[in-house]
Amino acid sequence: LEYSKEKKHGSDDLLGQENRLDWLTPLCLLGLSILSILFIQSAQAYTGGDQWKMQLIWCVLGFGAYLLFSWIDYHLWMRYAHFLYIIAILALLLVFGGPVLYGASRWIDFGIFKIQPSEIAKWTTMIMGASILARSKVGGMQDSLSGIAKVGLCFSLPMFLIFLQPDLGSTLVFPPIAFSLLYVARIPTRFFIATFVVFVVLIGVLGWDVFRYYQYKSENPRTSEATIAYEETSLVPLKDYQRKRILTFIAPEVEDPHGIGANWNRIQALIAVATGGITGKGLGNGMQAKLGYLPTAVAHNDFIFAVLAEESGLWGSLLAMLAYGLIIFGCLKVAAKSSDRFGAMIAVGVSVLLMTHLFVNVGMTIGITPITGLPLPFLSYGGSFLVTCFMMLGVVQSVYRYRKEFR
């Protein structure tokens, strides 16, 4: 990326300069928020759920956060990055004393609402990593290795704590963000080549473990005792349900040949997308969620795209993808116009986070990625992730607004 070398030329009237504001992103956010409320209500119409009302509240709070953070000079986050990072780590530690839902400790319960610190940690870790690299001298091998080591340590701690919850999906969001920051910081290419080699090796180890898991399951009774025995001998620290999801994705006919177990949600999501056709069945007329084939526990969050695709069809799905594309393109445009490396890293990091969630969530809905618990930005139900996404894009707007304030 080439950063503009603009200097400050006196104080600017921010209210009077339209070129300091990106109006397209908030319009896209408004459209996605409306779709979110409509399809969450539709997904729960049969059971009478009222999560759409909470989603409406979260959207209003999110837009408030977007406006607030867009007016705050983004350089402030660089100053307080360490403080925010420490708070996020402490919050991740607190979840282990909180409620256990769906077999995981991921939330801090405040009574009237819960927050998921892992979503906030994605943002604070990104800020911390960008702050480290912005203050570091990179280019030479020794300086670059120092920056890589600091960023690696910065990202490893929250990844480890989130993995223990367990939440493998959120854990895997961190590496793409880290690599995007390092790329913008212009770390030497040979580092990325070495990392790719390590990645291939890790994928090979994971594949070997899943193959061993399949063989073990074939030769031993499918009991909890057998599962525990395998986990104790495995070198890969995955839970049984995580291995099942991977095996279901690779060989569904092996793990769940009848499609009534681990492969159920995937099959029902594919049916929803396929039967939506070009124009969809109409709002509230989708059968998969309404009749319970797509379980109510996941239809309004992890599989909200399946509901959207069934009821609005290909055109509605493409419209949502267009909105995401414009938001992500807007982030990359801001990065290119940024006056400093810190602002560019924030904008690129946010775009990569959104792309990762988008690819994994939509991918699992249409059967090209394994099922994980990653929500779809601005569409899936949930407060922590939704408000955090609004905050992040607000900061990206701040980078665009204050791009001439670089000293």
Task: Pin down the residues of each PLM region.
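N-terminal low-complexity, intrinsically disordered patches enriched in charged
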Residues: A45, W71, A178, N285, ...
